[in-house]
Amino acid sequence: MKKLIFLLILTISCNNNIEIKPQVIAYYAGDEKSINEFDLEGVDQIIYSFLHLKGNKLAIDDKKDSLTLLNVINQKKKYPKLKVLVSLGGWGGCETCSDIFSSKKARIEFAISTADIIESFNADGIDLDWEYPGISGYPGHSYKLEDRENFTDLIIQLRKYMKKDHILSFAAGASYRFFENSIEWDKVMPLVDNVNLMTYDFYGSGSTKTGHHTALSSNEFQDRSAESSIEALMNLGVKPSQIFIGGAFYIKTFKNVANINNGLHQNAEWNRSYNQINFEDVRSNFNFYWDDVANSPYAYDSINKIFATFDDHKSIKLKSKYALDKKLGGIMFWQLMNDKKQNGLLKTMVNTIKP
């Protein structure tokens, strides 16, 4: 086993020494036809979201999802440089992951089934979105201390059974709890291509105060940010070129927010989320502001006492520039269906990463 791990690390390490150009990664959770409506020029990867476990194996849920995946992969004909990955899990989509992946036999069966799906669909790899190994995630989903080591072996098995040129990545929670308890970074990172750092959802349905849910920088009221998360990963020895900063193409809102400091860092109750399109229906109710310290936009509806937190063109541009300045692997975002078809946030992202 030690020899196998060494050979796998050596192979991937050689690949990691190649000069990496910053990339744009898009998660896609849409239907079969909508993907055709987006301009994907400049997008390096689309991660089709999501596939799930069926017993010990990776499985596509139904025929509709198969057709959608096929059409996403067909985009490679129009965009020859595009890579398409499948993703396991997502929020609420990995209910049995902890239990299934506790078995060596199951991890091997999963890896074999993953390689089969990638080959049969002519996909380019897999992104693991297990939320979360070793710590609590979706309410009611099991987790155990051993998940951390089991995740490492899961990566080893995937590398063993996937082709060498297939991409292997995973989505990581942007919290110190995740960093410390979910991943054996020194063992996992030499075997994967990159980590997609979910630098969003810092505030959400469980929050009792408002804040920037996808802040680039920290401020005196909010420690969690993209910068602090990335610095923490680097301190754990993760190479900048393997880290992708995350952008959020959706808006989170909170209600019953007092008209103090334009609603920022105030007591609140969760309201709802919007995408870039349906937020236009209520946009006129809001006044828009910018936090110079957190490098983040926010908005406040003083009539209805609603606070909104999001990424906009300015913050996406700053995140993209940060990725360039820090020589990160690039920037990723959740998700394409939340964007506008014309002059959306993706266009700003691509134009900044690839001027």
Protein language model features and the residues they cover:
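Sec-dependent N-terminal signal peptides
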Residues: 3-13
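Short acidic, glycine/proline-enriched helix-loop-strand junctions
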Residues: 137, 142-151, 164-166, 291-293, ...
